[in-house]
């Protein structure tokens, strides 16, 4: 199931960036992909759970990971090889092979929305960029005395009161405020 989702994700990215629509389909065991195909697969011989091997040949691209996560990180490498939003009629990738695995098991970034609210579209873009750079952990700081950003139906006052502030300090260590209501929640 995850391998299929990875294939659909890659096909959608290629469609958005080049305008080409790719078909995704499962191959029967032992069968060979047609020329020009991008093949995703699992290979338990790859040494790291998040490792992958990406091979580009004149007639096909093969991407194997030890797990679906490894395939996902290989897709990110492939994404970085395709110019974003080219709408070109073709994309030429140099032939070669990349064998990659993470040096560190924990690779993450933090987003503090407790102190400063970010719109949902920004958060989605941020997560997409984390994936593009092979980060595997997103630490989302949702609560703080400056803002409560997660709705809990049983406690509505947390967001009615805690998600908003009536003003924001201007600069540092000043008594000046902008008197603009600010905040939000997810």
Segment roles from a protein language model:
Residues 1-106:
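Contiguous, structured surface segment used for ligand recognition
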Residues 13, 81, 126-129, 133, ...:
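Generic, well-ordered alpha-helical scaffold segments in large soluble proteins
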Residues 60, 127-128, 182:
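Mature, folded catalytic cores of secreted/periplasmic enzymes
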Residues 64-65, 107-120, 174-186:
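The substrate-binding groove and active-site-proximal loops of carbohydrate-active enzymes
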Residues 98, 106-111, 142, 147, ...:
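Long, contiguous hydrophobic alpha-helical segments, chiefly transmembrane helices and signal peptides
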Residues 102, 146-186:
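Aromatic- and acidic-residue-enriched carbohydrate-binding clefts of CAZyme catalytic domains
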Residues 107, 127-128, 139-141, 159, ...:
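Catalytic alpha/beta active-site cores
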Residues 112-145, 149-152:
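A conserved hydrophobic secondary-structure block that centers on an alpha-helix together
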């Amino acid at each position: 199931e995850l391998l299929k989702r990875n294939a659909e994700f890659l096909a959608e990215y290629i469609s958005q960036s080049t305008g080409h629509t790719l078909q995704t389909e499962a191959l029967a065991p032992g069968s060979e992909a047609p020329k020009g195909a991008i093949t995703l697969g699992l290979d338990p011989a790859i040494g790291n759970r998040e490792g992958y091997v990406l091979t580009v040949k004149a007639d096909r691209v093969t991407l194997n990971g030890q797990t679906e996560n490894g395939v996902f990180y290989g897709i990110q490498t492939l994404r970085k090889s395709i110019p974003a939003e080219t709408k070109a009629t073709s994309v030429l990738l140099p032939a070669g092979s990349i064998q990659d695995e993470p040096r560190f098991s924990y690779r993450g970034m933090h987003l503090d929305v407790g102190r400063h609210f970010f719109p949902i579209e920004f958060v989605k873009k941020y997560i997409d960029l984390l994936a593009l750079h092979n980060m595997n952990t997103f630490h989302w700081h949702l609560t703080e005395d400056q803002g409560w950003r997660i709705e809990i139906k049983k406690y509505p006052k947390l967001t009615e009161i805690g998600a908003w502030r009536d003003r924001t300090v201007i600069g540092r260590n000043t008594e000046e405020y902008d008197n603009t209501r600010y905040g939000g929640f997810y």
